[in-house]
């Protein structure tokens, strides 16, 4: 195995962290301004750190408890007859993921609270310098998140390869290594959920409280130093849009790579990396994305005061994306082998893999462009809300809701096209690698996102410090661009979450051994509906939490205005710390229930109703959550920029309107309603769908078979099989009762059967069903020969031989691939498959006359012990008075156990007639 490429991955992460440290040191060296500016920045920094400490105190208890459960689950190595690839080390992986996610948030928070006041001071000199400081602060956040993710994943993967002595890609040891690695993603996503929800509640409780009393009731400007909630509001920008967004994208980044690795482990290729290229490819591409994100930052600069800041950010973003795509082309061609690659029956080439990466990049770009259109100032959607503000508060709300709902159309169509395009390029691996391609430049995306709240804080400090108007004009310029980048960042995050969740879903289906998600089944359909409901109740709880916390904030601000004389005259200083404490306590208290729903629901559904119903739940959550996330984020962003448009003046029906006008007051109401939409519940949707998917992936090995109807439907064995052939008579089982009544009338005790019976291939049949994405591939194979010999003295003997050259799935091209290709059945070399058994016993769990034959199945020269379940249907003379015995049954085999790179579990059903020789 060429191990050099494996060690390159964490090294790329370390490179990102080194550049992050250099840029962080540069930010710290910049001038922090006058004493009063430093004092205000100190309040913000102290409030932000107080929140993090309070949050970590609570989450540390959760992490210890969850790690203990995971450690216990890792000691379970067998359920029934099924071996598990588990290890207690998953608990360590979980803790590291949680710590790295928290550390990513801390790094971002720390540098943001340093960069804000330094951006304010830089704005006293020029727009160019202010952009440089604020964007460098954002870059520290971006590189910290991406560097920690790549370093953590790459480093742990190397450790686990050594720990579990992995020598083959398709080995049980590799399965264990990757399943343990899922703990890292679970830890990251768990912390991300609480950081995003808690941070969102914090920031919007402070924002809404500050706006309602400060701007609406007291009539003072935004970020006015006299407003007791203004420090909490500025702290909230860091808590929600820096730490929350950082943890969010850290989780997406890790989950995307991990989902691709899980699917890559199912692929068997002959390459120069020991068959590991499909597993390593997403890590290498994302690692190179860090390098090109660093290069992209060099292009983010402006020449003078009239330069367009948005264009500068876009140039850096497009450069990093373009360079990453170009590099991906060469990396894919270098790492992946020539010829066809197969995953679950879908064949593709390395050209298709690159095509999928390109599709993912294009989808991410389109999502950002569309989000910018619906939320940016000067665009038609925002202008429509401005116009509707002229007729009152209600029409402003109606306009914003309409814009948010319409904004789902193009993104959903884009996502649908991206899913289909990437799937056609490279199957489910293509969908996963498309998400990885989209996330590759996360460092740059997050740098642009984090720049926004830094600029917002800088403007707040300028306002509170009463700096000259030109300073506030420069910070407002940056802030306006920051609002748009924050909105586009949320669109990007939702798009990545959608593709990531689909990739995680595909990985879950493979590990859980599900053939298909059949929504015709009542439990699955029920799960689908419940899943669709969860984002609504989750959003309701988040918005309700903001409302409750905002009420407490409003009461506190009113109390201070009432009880502290001289605040409005600048003679007394407000008690900022009390408002900070209200937001902190409320966010910690209120985040627990939504977080609990996301974590516990998949566990309850999976362990009670099984993986198929859980699959239905995940499908409902994903579709509903993506729609809710896009709608709420875009509606909130549009309301926000509609309000901000009044600062420079807007033209409504030929008349100019400014701040404090009636239309402006209506826009403030809309912005207040939109705040929890765009900064709390909306952004939380993408973590919700990812976290529920990753929890399902982690528990998948433990819920295999739960909810299965194998034991209750004896003749059909699986409820998907609705027809039985018993002694030449075909029956249709429309219900369990009907099925049982038929079988009870025909089942016999095999003890009555003695002697030799030769299998009659002409009157016997064998069908198979192999999972193929969501829909099964069904086919048949001819039973070539065989016999059943029963003798009390010598013991039973069963032998069956299959003619593998007769594989038939009603598709000539697919049949040719299945028969001829080495990664499938390779019938030119292995023409026959056999089953031999010398032990038959009753299986009381399946019924009084149900039996299990324990024997050896040989396919492609590979021998595995299997259990064949069957019912003896009795004997009956044919027209020539030859005694005929009948058998029906099934067995299940894992395709990979026999070197077949198609699907997961193959279900085999058979009906056999065997004739007793006449002499």
Spans of features found by a protein language model:
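Low-complexity, acidic/polar, glycine-enriched regions of mature
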Residues: 741-919
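Short, solvent-exposed coil/turn linker segments
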Residues: 308, 349, 732-733, 803, ...
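Intrinsic disorder/low-complexity detector
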Residues: 451, 485, 688, 712, ...
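Intrinsically disordered, low-complexity regions
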Residues: 75, 81, 155, 237, ...
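Hydrophobic packing and interface segments
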Residues: 1-716
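A general marker of short, structured functional hotspots
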Residues: 3, 47, 249, 501, ...
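Low-complexity, intrinsically disordered regions enriched in charged/polar residues
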Residues: 21, 679, 733-737, 812
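Intrinsically disordered, low-complexity terminal tails/loops enriched in metal-binding residues
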Residues: 712-752
């Amino acid at each position: 195995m060429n191990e050099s490429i494996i060690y390159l991955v964490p090294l790329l992460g370390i490179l990102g962290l080194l550049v992050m440290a250099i840029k962080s040191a540069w930010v710290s060296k910049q001038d922090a301004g006058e004493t009063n500016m430093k004092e205000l920045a100190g309040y913000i920094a102290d409030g932000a750190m107080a929140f993090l400490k309070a949050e970590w105190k609570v989450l540390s208890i959760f992490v210890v408890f969850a790690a203990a459960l995971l450690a216990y689950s890792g000691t379970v190595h067998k359920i029934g007859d099924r071996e598990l690839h588990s290890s207690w080390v998953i608990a360590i992986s979980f803790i590291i993921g949680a710590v790295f996610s928290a550390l990513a948030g801390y790094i971002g928070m720390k540098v943001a609270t340093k960069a804000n006041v330094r951006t304010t001071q830089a704005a006293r000199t020029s727009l160019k310098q202010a952009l440089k400081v604020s964007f460098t602060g954002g870059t520290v956040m971006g590189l910290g998140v991406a560097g920690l993710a790549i370093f953590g994943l790459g480093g742990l993967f190397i450790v686990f390869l050594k720990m579990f002595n992995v020598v083959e890609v398709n080995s049980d040891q590799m399965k264990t290594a990757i399943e343990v690695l899922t703990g890292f993603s679970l830890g990251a996503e768990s912390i991300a959920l609480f950081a995003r929800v808690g941070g969102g509640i914090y920031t919007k409780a402070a924002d809404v409280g500050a706006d309602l009393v400060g701007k609406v009731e007291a009539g003072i400007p935004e970020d006015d130093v006299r407003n007791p909630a203004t420090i909490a509001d500025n702290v909230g920008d860091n808590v929600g849009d820096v730490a929350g967004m950082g943890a969010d994208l850290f989780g997406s980044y890790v989950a995307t790579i991990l989902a691709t690795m899980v699917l890559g482990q199912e692929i068997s290729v002959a390459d120069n990396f020991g068959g590991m290229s499909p597993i390593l490819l997403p890590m290498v591409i994302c690692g190179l994305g860090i390098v090109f994100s660093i290069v992209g930052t060099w292009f983010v600069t402006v020449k003078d005061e009239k330069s367009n800041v948005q264009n500068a950010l876009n140039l850096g973003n497009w450069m990093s994306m373009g360079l990453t795509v170009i590099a991906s082309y060469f990396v894919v061609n270098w790492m992946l082998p020539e010829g066809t690659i197969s995953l679950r029956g879908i064949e593709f080439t390395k050209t298709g893999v690159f095509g999928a990466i390109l599709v993912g990049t294009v989808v991410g770009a389109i999502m950002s462009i569309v989000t910018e259109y619906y939320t940016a100032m000067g665009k038609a959607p925002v202008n429509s809300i401005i116009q509707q503000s002229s007729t009152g508060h209600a029409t402003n709300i109606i306009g914003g809701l309409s814009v948010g709902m319409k904004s789902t159309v193009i993104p959903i169509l884009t996502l649908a096209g991206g899913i289909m395009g990437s799937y056609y390029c490279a199957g489910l691996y293509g969908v996963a690698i498309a998400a990885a391609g989209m996330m590759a430049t996360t460092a740059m995306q997050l740098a642009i996102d984090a720049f926004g709240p830094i600029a917002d804080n800088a403007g707040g400090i300028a306002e509170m410090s009463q700096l000259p108007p030109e300073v506030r004009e420069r910070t407002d310029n940056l802030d306006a661009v920051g609002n748009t980048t924050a909105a586009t960042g949320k669109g990007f995050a939702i798009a990545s979450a959608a593709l990531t969740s689909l990739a995680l879903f595909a990985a879950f289906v493979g590990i859980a051994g599900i053939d298909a998600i059949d929504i015709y089944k009542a439990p699955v359909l029920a799960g689908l509906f419940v899943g669709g409901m969860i984002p609504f109740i989750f959003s309701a709880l988040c918005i309700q939490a903001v409302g409750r916390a905002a009420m407490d904030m409003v009461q506190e601000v009113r109390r201070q205005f009432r009880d502290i004389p001289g605040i409005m005259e600048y003679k007394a200083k407000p008690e900022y710390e009390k408002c900070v404490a209200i937001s902190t306590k409320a966010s910690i208290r209120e985040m627990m229930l939504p977080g609990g729903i996301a974590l516990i629901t998949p566990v309850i559904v999976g362990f009670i109703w099984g993986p198929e119903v859980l699959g239905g739940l995940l499908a409902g959550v994903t579709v509903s959550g993506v729609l809710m996330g896009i709608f709420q984020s875009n509606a909130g962003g549009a309301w926000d920029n509609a309000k901000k448009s009044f600062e420079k003046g807007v033209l409504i029906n030929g008349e100019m309107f400014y701040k404090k006008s009636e239309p402006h007051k209506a826009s403030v109401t809309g912005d207040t309603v939109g705040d929890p939409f765009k900064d709390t519940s909306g952004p939380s949707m993408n973590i919700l769908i990812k976290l529920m998917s990753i929890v399902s992936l982690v528990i998948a090995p433990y819920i295999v078979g739960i909810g299965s109807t194998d034991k209750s439907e004896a003749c059909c064995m699986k409820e998907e099989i609705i027809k039985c052939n018993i002694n030449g008579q075909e029956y249709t089982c429309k219900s369990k009762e009907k099925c049982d009544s038929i079988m009870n009338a025909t089942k016999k005790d095999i003890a009555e059967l003695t002697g030799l019976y030769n299998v009659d291939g002409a009157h016997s049949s064998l069908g198979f069903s192999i999972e193929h994405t969501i829909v099964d591939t069904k086919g048949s194979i001819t039973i070539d020969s065989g016999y059943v010999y029963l003798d009390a003295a010598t013991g039973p003997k069963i032998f069956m031989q299959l003619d593998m050259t007769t594989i038939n799935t009603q598709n000539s091209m697919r049949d040719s691939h299945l028969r001829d290709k080495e990664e499938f059945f390779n019938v030119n070399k292995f023409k026959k498959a056999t089953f031999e058994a010398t032990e038959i016993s009753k299986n009381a769990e399946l019924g009084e006359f149900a039996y299990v034959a324990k024997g050896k199945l040989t396919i492609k020269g590979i021998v595995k012990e299997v259990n064949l379940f069957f019912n003896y249907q009795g004997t009956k003379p044919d027209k020539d008075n030859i005694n005929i015995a009948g058998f029906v049954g099934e067995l299940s085999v894992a395709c990979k156990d026999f070197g077949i790179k198609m699907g997961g579990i193959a279900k085999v059903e058979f009906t056999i007639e065997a004739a007793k020789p006449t002499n």
